[in-house]
Each structure stands twice: as C-alpha cells, then as structure tokens.
From Swiss-Prot:
Its EC number is 2.7.7.72, 3.1.3.-, 3.1.4.-. Mg(2+) binds at D21, D23. This is Multifunctional CCA protein. Its cofactor is Mg(2+); Ni(2+). One of its GO terms (biological process) is RNA repair. The gene is cca. CDD domains: HDc, NT_ClassII-CCAase. HAMAP family: CCA_bact_type1 (MF_01261), CCA_bact_type2 (MF_01262). It comes from Aliivibrio salmonicida (strain LFI1238). Monomer. Can also form homodimers and oligomers. Residues 228-329 form the HD domain. Catalyzes the addition and repair of the essential 3'-terminal CCA sequence in tRNAs without using a nucleic acid template. Adds these three nucleotides in the order of C, C, and A to the tRNA nucleotide-73, using CTP and ATP as substrates and producing inorganic pyrophosphate. tRNA 3'-terminal CCA addition is required both for tRNA processing and repair. Also involved in tRNA surveillance by mediating tandem CCA addition to generate a CCACCA at the 3' terminus of unstable tRNAs. While stable tRNAs receive only 3'-terminal CCA, unstable tRNAs are marked with CCACCA and rapidly degraded. It comes from the Bacteria. Magnesium is required for nucleotidyltransferase activity.
C-alpha cells in the first residue's frame, strides 16, 4: 500500500499558492483493508475514505470507463492492481495530474510541471471529451489562474468545442452548473469564466440568458463598447475589483439580462430592460437554483440601476420611493451592495473605466439624511395610524431636500 498527495494540493504548492485542502490517492489497497486501518468510508460512486485523525479524503486509485451519458455516466474500477499512472490518466488537466510521494518525490507522467511553467491548461488524454463537467471546470481554472498568465491549450479548446457539439452538456445538473459558476465568482477574473464558455459554445447551453447578450448593440453615446455581452464581461471585471462579495459579483453579471430580449426593432435602445430583466433573472435563478441572497440583490440591481445612474436628476420624493422599494429601512446594508454594482456598471464601459461615479455618494447622502428621521419623533408629535406613515415620508423628503440642497 502506497499513499500519494495528488491534484490541487500539489499544483498549488508548485505555484506557491497556499494549500487549503489535501487529497490523497491510495495505491495497492482495498476497502476492507482501509476499514481495518480505521478509515471511514464516505464515497458513494467510488471508494473514498476519511482519515481517522485528519479527516482528509483518501481515494483508492481507480480507472473510469464511459458507460452512459453525462458526467455520472462512468463505470469505476478501483482494485488493488490499479497503478498511480492509471489513476492520474483519468484526470482532467495535466496540472492536476501530478502526484507527490511521502518522501516529496514528484510523479508527473503527463508533463504537468512543464505546463505549469508554460502557464497552459491542457487535457491529460482524449478521454477529456467523455465528461461534460470538464468544460465548466476548465473555464473556472482559466478564471482562477488568469492573473498568473494561464491560457487554454488550443487543442484542449478544440476538445471543449467537440464536447459542446456532442450534446453532453445537456446532461449537467443545475446544481453542478451553479457550483462551478459560484466558484468562478471567487476568482480574480470571474469574467474569464463566461468568456471561455462563450468561446467554446457552452454559454449558449448552460447560461443562454447571458449568451443572448452577445451581438446585441447599445447606444454608442453611452456604451463605446456597443456589444452588450462585452459590456457584461467588463462590468463583471469591474465588480471583482470593487468587491469580494459573491452576490455583488453575480448581480453584476446578470443585471442587464433584459437587454437580451429587447426586440430588434428597438435596438440599440433598451428603455424597458430594467423591467423585462426581472422575469429573466427569476427564471435563470430558478433553473440553476441560485441562492436567494444572490437572487434578491440581482433583482434589486436590475430594477434600480438606471435610477441610481440618474441620481443627480432625481427629486427628493423619488429618492424616498426608491428607498421604499429597496426595503432599505429594514435592510439598510443593501444600499452599499446595490451601489457597488451600479458603480461597476458605470465603469464597465470602453475607455470610461476610470470615470468618477458621484451618484454613489449622492445616493448615500440622501439615504443617510432620510434614515435620521425616526418614527418615534413622528409618534411623539401626536400623529396616529395612517398619518404616521404619511408624516414620516413627508419628513424624510424634507430631510433629503436639505441634505442635497434640492429646492
């Protein structure tokens, strides 16, 4: 029995990235033997065990043979005669197919170290096309390692296109699509995840609502980049520079989905996209099973981002109406997230990335002024029942007028 450190832990160590999780592969053992050593069996599809002390995952070396459709359509063989090289051969990318012995010796039969040096994401074997999930994984790795200069090997991109055209991606479950998408949001370049999926054709299959934005024009006066899809990628990147919040980064990517269903006869104008986008976002979130925290922020940004952009023109009563709709009196922390998304939208335009965004400060000033008007003061003044709400709104409007010097 021999044990090797494998996968991401070896890769990240070689890239001088902090190793968070360690995965191990066990060669020359059986489930019975592992159980006798105190390891806890947890694998359903193949033999995986938790170490009795560290609780790290130890998987028996295995081979996989395609036996059906989708990423679960495999038959696994995990007997004691499976070699380390055979186990590494089934992995997706060469940089993930490097093992390390207990003495620190690297076993690298598929030249992963060379690809790490050359900053290449390359498939291990042509069996890559048997697993549709690998398209999303490669896109995620491209996003994660973009800051290090990694690119996808041309022959691997070609296999990704082959996988897409085979129809295999239709067998991906919504949970797996969201799992990879959400992981990509935590990278330094979430936009690369979408652009890679667009390049290989997968975006139209797994996230057609975002794919529909490409080729849709916007007014050049406001959007020098013109293409809505390109704008979305730019906004995504700006959001990642402004915040590490995953809901903010998600909302930035979907805030303009309404533009994807604007009738061509109305192009390049999209006057109703803040309203039409609501249903598109709801349907997307339902299909891919996006958590409510993400969905709620995305809907708020979709509905209100054009109003925020017009903050310098808004009347005091309009500010209060917007704050009411955002439910800020109960959830004031929402405002910062919404405004950061709007700032990313403003900056996500070709040549305008560094333009100031005074609208954010104006919205904050208006809300801070309105928030200082307290209900107890209205009640103490003798107002009762429905009068309280009316007077509270009236006082909030006056507070905004004073704060923003609005007549």
């Amino acid at each position: 029995m021999q044990i090797y450190l494998v996968g991401g832990a070896v890769r990240d160590s070689l890239l001088n990235i902090d190793v968070k999780d360690k995965d191990w592969v066990v060669v020359g053992s059986t489930p019975t033997h592992m159980n006798s050593l105190g390891y806890q069996s947890v694998g359903q599809d193949f033999p995986v065990f938790l170490h009795p002390r560290t609780k790290e995952e130890y998987a028996l070396a295995r081979t996989e043979r395609k036996s059906g459709q989708g990423y679960k359509g495999f038959t696994c063989y995990a007997e004691a005669d499976v070699t380390l090289e055979e186990d590494l051969l089934r992995r997706d990318l060469t940089i993930n197919a490097i093992a390390q012995s207990d003495k620190g010796l690297l076993i690298d039969p598929y030249h992963g170290q060379e690809d790490l040096k050359n900053r290449l994401l390359r498939h291990v074997s042509n069996a890559f096309v048997e697993d549709p999930l690998r398209v999303l994984r490669v896109a995620r790795f491209a996003a994660r390692f973009h800051y290090l200069g990694f690119t996808i090997a041309p022959e691997t991109m070609q296999l990704m296109k082959t996988l897409v055209s085979s129809g295999e991606l239709s067998h991906l479950t919504p949970e797996r699509v969201w799992q990879e998408w959400e992981k990509s949001l935590s990278s330094k370049h979430p936009n690369i995840f979408l652009s890679v999926l667009k390049e290989c054709g997968a975006l139209a299959v797994v996230l057609p609502e975002i794919d529909a934005l490409f080729g849709v024009p916007q007014p050049e006066q406001w959007h020098p980049e013109i293409d809505t899809g390109m704008h979305t990628l730019m906004v995504s990147q700006q959001a990642s520079l402004l915040s590490t919040s995953l809901p903010i980064r998600f909302a930035a990517q979907v805030h303009d989905l309404g533009k994807g269903i604007t009738p061509e006869s109305e192009w390049p104008s999209h006057k109703m996209h803040c309203h039409t986008g609501i249903k598109v976002i709801k349907n997307l979130c339902k299909r891919v099973r996006v958590p409510n925290e993400y969905k709620e922020l995305a809907l708020l940004v979709c509905e209100h981002h054009t109003n925020v952009h017009r903050a310098s023109e808004l009347r005091a009563q309009t500010f209060i109406k917007i704050f009411d709709k955002m439910d800020l009196w109960r959830k004031p922390e929402r405002l910062e997230s919404i405004l950061l998304c709007c700032q990313a939208d403003h900056a996500g335009r070709l040549g305008l990335e560094l333009n100031p965004y005074p609208q954010k400060e104006r919205m904050e000033s208006a809300f801070n002024a309105a928030q200082h008007v307290e209900v107890k003061e209205v009640v103490a003044a003798g107002f009762k029942g429905p009068e309280i709400r009316d007077e509270l709104t009236k006082r909030r409007i006056e507070a905004v007028k004073v704060a923003l010097l609005i007549n």
